[in-house]
């Protein structure tokens, strides 16, 4: 039962990531949203997001 629950949660997380990637692929690419790969040679992050120097993707700006 415990393994089934963990597998279900991992599957759901994978589904959400794939759905997000499909949505990003359909956008016009002017700016990057959450978890968008950013940095040199890549589109800038959208308003409300900042490029994380540690991870190299767009994250929510700290207040």
Swiss-Prot record:
It is found in: Secreted. Expressed by the venom gland. Residues 1-27 form the signal peptide. InterPro entries: Huwentoxin-1 (IPR011696). SUPFAM superfamilies: omega toxin-like. Pfam families: Toxin_12. GO terms for molecular function: ion channel inhibitor activity; potassium channel regulator activity; sodium channel regulator activity; toxin activity. One of its GO terms (cellular component) is extracellular region. Disulfide bonds join 31-46, 38-51, 45-58. Its main location: secreted. Keywords: Disulfide bond, Ion channel impairing toxin, Knottin, Neurotoxin, Potassium channel impairing toxin, Secreted, Signal, Toxin, Voltage-gated potassium channel impairing toxin, Voltage-gated sodium channel impairing toxin. The presence of a 'disulfide through disulfide knot' structurally defines this protein as a knottin. Belongs to the neurotoxin 10 (Hwtx-1) family. 44 (Jztx-4) subfamily. Selectively inhibits activation of voltage-gated sodium channels (VGSC) (Nav1.5/SCN5A) in rat cardiac myocytes, followed by shifting activated voltage in a depolarizing direction. The binding site on VGSC is suggested to be site 4 located at the extracellular S3-S4 loop of the channel. Also binds to voltage-gated potassium channels (Kv2.1/KCNB1). This is Beta/kappa-theraphotoxin-Cg1a. It comes from Chilobrachys guangxiensis. The lineage of its organism: Eukaryota, Metazoa, Ecdysozoa, Arthropoda, Chelicerata.
């Amino acid at each position: 039962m415990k393994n089934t629950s963990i597998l279900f949660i991992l599957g759901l997380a994978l589904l959400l990531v794939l759905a997000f990637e499909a949505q990003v692929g359909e956008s016009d690419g002017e700016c990057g949203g959450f978890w968008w790969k950013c940095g040199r040679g890549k589109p800038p992050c959208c308003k409300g997001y900042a490029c994380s120097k540690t991870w190299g993707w767009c994250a929510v700006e700290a207040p």
